[in-house]
From Swiss-Prot:
This is Glycerol-3-phosphate dehydrogenase [NAD(P)+]. GO terms for cellular component: cytosol. GO terms for molecular function: glycerol-3-phosphate dehydrogenase [NAD(P)+] activity; NAD binding. InterPro entries: 6-PGluconate_DH-like_C_sf, 6PGD_dom2, G3P_DH_NAD-dep, G3P_DH_NAD-dep_C, G3P_DH_NAD-dep_N, NAD(P)-bd_dom_sf. It is an enzyme of class 1 (oxidoreductase). The active site is at 192 (proton acceptor). Keywords: Cytoplasm, Lipid biosynthesis, Lipid metabolism, NAD, NADP, Nucleotide-binding, Oxidoreductase, Phospholipid biosynthesis, Phospholipid metabolism. The gene is gpsA. NADPH binds at residues 11-12, 32, 106, 141, 256, 280, 282. HAMAP family: NAD_Glyc3P_dehydrog. Sn-glycerol 3-phosphate binds at residues 106, 137, 139, 192, 245, 255-257. Pathway: Membrane lipid metabolism; glycerophospholipid metabolism.
Amino acid sequence: MRKITVFGMGSFGTALANVLAQNGHDVLMWGKNVENVDELNTHHMNKNYLKDAKLDSSIKATVDLNKAVQFSDIYLMALPTKAIREVSKDIDQLLTSKKTFIHVAKGIENDTFKRVSEMIEDSISSEHNGGIGVLSGPSHAEEVVIKQPTTVAASSKDNNVSKLIQDLFMNDYLRVYTNNDLVGVELGGALKNIIAIASGIVAGMGWGDNAKAALMTRGLAEISRLGEKLGADPMTFLGLGGIGDLIVTCTSTHSRNYTLGFKLGQGKTAEEALKEMKMVVEGIYTTKSVYHLAQQEGVEMPITNALYEVLFEDVPVSKSVRTLMERDKKAE
């Protein structure tokens, strides 16, 4: 049995905390919302994110950051990408020894274009950094928490960290593979959110399977082009952290990114759609980051460009689609 602190009380962090507790580990969750913390401690539920799920009664929660930091040597960073750097810096101020950091965020930082592991590495002093890894793949929290079969990938620059993640999380309903391509696994998880929004738009506009299949296929090509330019192994994008995550996010109403896109396809503005959803949609921020990153790296990403225009330049969806379809003739 290990002690593990989960930073963040969203849907995926909660589902994974439940996995860890059911695997026999001692789990403490940290969050800022007092009502969420009280609900988890008293009723063993997190209705804001996982409405009807009854969680393992051994899981505890706190709003006390110092208590959370001192509780364990293994940290699961289940926070939105935009919160990772700030919380990591706050954690570092309270550390006196090395800790292992496992993150599940799927995004790229807006200003720096850095991956989440790089953000954590920047924020944690070397004397406190005992290794950084990621757990990623096709894994809706709503399915994980009710023990539906799920398979994901664990990756780190340190193979010992990858194996630790595998050992902590793997059980009879959650299968974990190790993967030594940290860059590829992180990029696959982040970039697929862009394509998921676009996929939701296609569905919201009422288009058929032809359009959906083409979008996912050409979307995977974009992801692979940028990933390879940034040092990823192209084969990673054919695995769980790539096409696996892409398929599940582009085809399910569990996906916030797909749901946002669906609302856009039905004619709502991004502002209207987000107001209805009341949840973080990583793909919006990732679209902005990747649009500028692709320009900086000289990588062609037409779907990303079209979505950027819709989200940030108020270009009508119908016009962006027409622009995509009328691009110059090319070989595949």
